[in-house]
């Protein structure tokens, strides 16, 4: 068996075109969607992520604002800038690129963002609302994975799903979205005993731990859907995920590649969340 490839690039292109149409409709009414991205320090990976987010905005008719600060920026200065953006009617979404320098409390920074502009979905108000099934925003990466399941008609109701990873950014919200969709969900992590015993029984496996080859072919049920959220580098310096793609793709029914899988969807869902924020603001105006 050779798995069907879940093409994040192609799906992302379709969804971005839809987002661009919605953005144009809002702009015609005087409510062009606006996203502010804040980068503190000079982390090379963060610089790439921010550049890609700004480009996605520009390519799809969004207003974008990039604030770049040195790593010496103080926490009070950052909080003051977020307060300004919270009050700026041109800005509908605020994103602070993580990680932040060690002297800045990322939790305090995230909580400073107005919940209605928290397009990452990390604010405690949105995280709590996700638990009730009625969030303002779904975190972008898990939201993108759910769109992949929808596009490729992967049945979730009654499915056994394993999420490897328990981060607030991917693992926990991914489990909640799968649960809401009717799956029976198991969360595995670094302390899990017999990881393979869980994954072999799963119809769906989402790997999100940032560790190469955490999932190999012998750990996968034939025909299962495997979603690789990991972003790592192999010994040659090439981008790879958490899944042994060469082996698992011969066993799984569906699989996402790295690159070209979940990555493009994360930025796309950031656009979707920003559109939704702008539409709410326009409706309230």
From Swiss-Prot:
One of its GO terms (cellular component) is cytosol. This is Bifunctional protein FolD. Catalyzes the oxidation of 5,10-methylenetetrahydrofolate to 5,10-methenyltetrahydrofolate and then the hydrolysis of 5,10-methenyltetrahydrofolate to 10-formyltetrahydrofolate. InterPro entries: Aminoacid_DH-like_N_sf, NAD(P)-bd_dom_sf, THF_DH/CycHdrlase, THF_DH/CycHdrlase_cat_dom, THF_DH/CycHdrlase_CS, THF_DH/CycHdrlase_NAD-bd_dom. Keywords: Amino-acid biosynthesis, Histidine biosynthesis, Hydrolase, Methionine biosynthesis, Multifunctional enzyme, NADP, One-carbon metabolism, Oxidoreductase, Purine biosynthesis. One of its GO terms (molecular function) is methenyltetrahydrofolate cyclohydrolase activity. It catalyses: (6R)-5,10-methylene-5,6,7,8-tetrahydrofolate + NADP(+) = (6R)-5,10-methenyltetrahydrofolate + NADPH; (6R)-5,10-methenyltetrahydrofolate + H2O = (6R)-10-formyltetrahydrofolate + H(+). It comes from the Bacteria. Belongs to the tetrahydrofolate dehydrogenase/cyclohydrolase family. GO terms for biological process: L-histidine biosynthetic process; methionine biosynthetic process; purine nucleotide biosynthetic process; tetrahydrofolate interconversion. The lineage of its organism: Bacteria, Pseudomonadati, Pseudomonadota, Betaproteobacteria, Burkholderiales. Pathway: One-carbon metabolism; tetrahydrofolate interconversion. PANTHER family: C-1-TETRAHYDROFOLATE SYNTHASE, CYTOPLASMIC, C-1-TETRAHYDROFOLATE SYNTHASE, CYTOPLASMIC-RELATED. Its EC number is 1.5.1.5, 3.5.4.9.
């Amino acid at each position: 068996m050779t798995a069907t490839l879940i093409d994040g690039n192609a799906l992302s292109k379709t969804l971005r075109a839809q987002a661009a149409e919605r953005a144009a409709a809002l702009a015609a009414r005087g409510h062009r969607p606006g996203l502010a991205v804040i980068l503190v320090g000079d982390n090379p990976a963060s610089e790439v992520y921010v550049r890609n987010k700004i480009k996605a905005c520009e390519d799809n008719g969004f207003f974008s604002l990039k604030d770049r600060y040195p790593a010496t920026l103080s926490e009070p200065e950052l909080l003051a800038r977020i307060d300004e953006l919270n009050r700026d009617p041109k800005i509908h979404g605020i994103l602070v690129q993580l990680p932040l320098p060690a002297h800045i409390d990322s939790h305090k920074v995230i909580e400073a963002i107005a919940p209605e502009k928290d397009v990452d979905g990390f604010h405690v108000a949105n995280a709590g609302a996700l638990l009730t099934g009625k969030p303002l925003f779904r975190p972008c990466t898990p939201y993108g994975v759910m769109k992949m399941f929808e596009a490729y008609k992967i049945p979730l109701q009654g499915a056994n799903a394993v999420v490897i990873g328990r981060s607030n950014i991917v693992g926990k919200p991914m489990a909640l979205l799968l649960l809401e969709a009717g799956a029976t969900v198991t969360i595995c992590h670094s302390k899990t005993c017999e990881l393979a015993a869980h994954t072999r029984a799963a119809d769906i496996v989402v790997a999100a731990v940032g560790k190469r080859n955490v999932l190999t072919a012998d750990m996968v049920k034939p025909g299962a859907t495997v979603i690789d959220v990991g972003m790592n580098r192999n010994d040659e310096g090439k981008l790879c995920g958490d899944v042994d793609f060469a082996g698992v793709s011969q066993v799984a029914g569906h699989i996402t590649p790295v690159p070209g899988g979940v990555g493009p969807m994360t930025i796309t869902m950031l656009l979707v969340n920003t559109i939704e924020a702008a539409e709410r603001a326009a409706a309230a105006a």
